[in-house]
Amino acid sequence: MQILLANPRGFCAGVDRAISIVERALEIYGAPIYVRHEVVHNRYVVDSLRERGAVFIEEITEVPDGSILIFSAHGVSQAVRAEAKARDLTMLFDATCPLVTKVHMEVARASRRGTEAILIGHAGHPEVEGTMGQYSNPKGGMYLVESPDDVWKLQVKDESNLCFMTQTTLSVDDTSDVIDALRKRFPSIIGPRKDDICYATTNRQEAVRNLAGDADVVLVVGSKNSSNSNRLAELAQRVGKPAYLIDSAADIQEAWLKDAHNIGVTAGASAPDVLVQDVISRLKALGGVNVQEVSGREENIVFEVPKELRVDIKQVD
């Protein structure tokens, strides 16, 4: 049984930055450090940070006065940001992915101009809630669509003054279908200058598509609440291969591997490599004899942490 590893896989620059912000805050200021929402959607990462003193909350009211608060990588609405700034907090750090912030700026610009904005995204996802919450102009409008059907049912105030943007972790193929529907339904609609689906999402989906061609089964390391991890499993299934989303090696069922000669392995953008290595070890124990890295796009993007956290940890008492 051969093990095929997708490239790229695992952590993206935004996730790396968000985790580093929490880790450095803990090292510099000490526990507890409060984080609004899971900093990234991965159970292993969240549990590890919680053990070190991170406290994950959903409401700003849960944060005691004088505390340090961090916004998660998914971003927050203007209302949440204002609520946090009104509190008596020692420090407030923003771990929002810069590529999510880019979409926030697009929405805020539309709001200032009174242009109605349509967001393609999944209802209830924290990134979507934060992005929708950048729009405040009552003369315009902000709408959420998930499918072409939603587009055809949508009613807006002025079809000649519309723009759209997307959640950063969507399926490239599904989003293309929704954008096609938007352009047919609203011919004058204006899209972003550069695709809102982030480089990491696109690259990992492309890697899974390449991997699935040679794999009999695909294992995606990622948590159930991770949007980009779910999209990877769906993509492998769409090209006709059995695919399973797993939090860890312990989730692997031997029955999945029956009669399989090539096992494809990838990881969502919020899944650490240690989990992938555990999966490889588990597969070797089940008969895997060779590990092959499948070539893919190289990634060298790095996002810096806030300047207050750019200190030599060794110098911290």
Swiss-Prot record:
- State the reactions this protein catalyses: isopentenyl diphosphate + 2 oxidized [2Fe-2S]-[ferredoxin] + H2O = (2E)-4-hydroxy-3-methylbut-2-enyl diphosphate + 2 reduced [2Fe-2S]-[ferredoxin] + 2 H(+); dimethylallyl diphosphate + 2 oxidized [2Fe-2S]-[ferredoxin] + H2O = (2E)-4-hydroxy-3-methylbut-2-enyl diphosphate + 2 reduced [2Fe-2S]-[ferredoxin] + 2 H(+)
Q: Give the residues annotated as active site.
A: 127 (proton donor)
Write out the GO MF terms: 4 iron, 4 sulfur cluster binding; 4-hydroxy-3-methylbut-2-enyl diphosphate reductase activity; metal ion binding
Query: What pathway or pathways are given for this protein in its record?
Result: Isoprenoid biosynthesis; dimethylallyl diphosphate biosynthesis; dimethylallyl diphosphate from (2E)-4-hydroxy-3-methylbutenyl diphosphate: step 1/1; Isoprenoid biosynthesis; isopentenyl diphosphate biosynthesis via DXP pathway; isopentenyl diphosphate from 1-deoxy-D-xylulose 5-phosphate: step 6/6
- Where along this sequence does the record place binding of [4Fe-4S] cluster? 12, 97, 198
Q: What is its EC number?
A: 1.17.7.4
Binding-site positions, isopentenyl diphosphate:
41, 74, 125, 226-228, 270
Q: Does the keyword Metal-binding apply?
A: yes
Q: Which cofactor does it need?
A: [4Fe-4S] cluster
Q: Where is the signal peptide?
A: none
**Residues reported to bind (2E)-4-hydroxy-3-methylbut-2-enyl diphosphate:** 41, 74, 125, 168, 226-228, 270
Q: Which GO terms describe its biological process?
A: dimethylallyl diphosphate biosynthetic process; isopentenyl diphosphate biosynthetic process, methylerythritol 4-phosphate pathway; terpenoid biosynthetic process
Under HAMAP family, the record lists: IspH
Q: What does this protein do?
A: Catalyzes the conversion of 1-hydroxy-2-methyl-2-(E)-butenyl 4-diphosphate (HMBPP) into a mixture of isopentenyl diphosphate (IPP) and dimethylallyl diphosphate (DMAPP). Acts in the terminal step of the DOXP/MEP pathway for isoprenoid precursor biosynthesis.
Similarity field:
Belongs to the IspH family.
What's the protein name?
4-hydroxy-3-methylbut-2-enyl diphosphate reductase
Organism, scientific name:
Serratia proteamaculans (strain 568)
